[in-house]
Amino acid sequence: MFDVLTEVYSGSSQINSMFSNYIIFLFSSPVLSNFGLYLEYMTPERKGKLATVLSKRQAGLAIVMENVHDPHNIAAVMRTCDAVGIQDIFILNTKIQSHKKFGPRSSSSAAKWLTIHHYNDAGICFLELRKRYSKILTTHLATDSVDLYEIDFTQNVALVFGNEHEGVTEEIRALADGNFIIPQTGIIQSLNISVACAVSIYEAMRQKKAAGHYQQPSLPKERIDGLMKEWGFYEKKV
């Protein structure tokens, strides 16, 4: 059967179109996916692209969003995280309901390439963050806040961004290691959360690149293998 499918899949575009849904169904089934058979039918170019992306994912950098109301802002943060190479995003909702989707389809497409951790308990969320990251910093203007450019992003760091109206709550600031600010010289001393996140993590990327963190895989091999299979499945659904 697999020889027949191979011949069909490598045939004309018209035949591919006729049988694509059938092949997708077969190779997304639990039995076949356990053996990674869907990856066999991914093009070498696509496999190479996914492998390259995964090799640059940064295990030592994460974003936490606390009670962010607008799903479009969450979607924008996700797209920037994917661009920088952040795999893990933590969404903490202690005051609002969890979002069922993040913005329009075109803007939320980055979500399927990321690992989204949902929490509604701040204490449990921070227990997990402490296992992974040596420093947790919140975006908050205070007398003890450090400048973004003073943060050592060669360490394992998680950055916390608050919602659009109140910022990071006092509860979360008490759980974190400190606060940081993005230096500004304008009249309006605030940025949209998606803009603030982009500015912050591109500084992290700059430091990590200079330190050689993008030159070798950061994620454990078993996680890279798992994500490769997961991403292969998504590619069959697109």
Predicted regions and their residues:
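Short, intrinsically disordered low-complexity segments enriched in Ser/Thr with adjacent Pro
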Residues: 3-16
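Post-transcriptional modification and biogenesis factors for structured RNAs
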Residues: 22-238
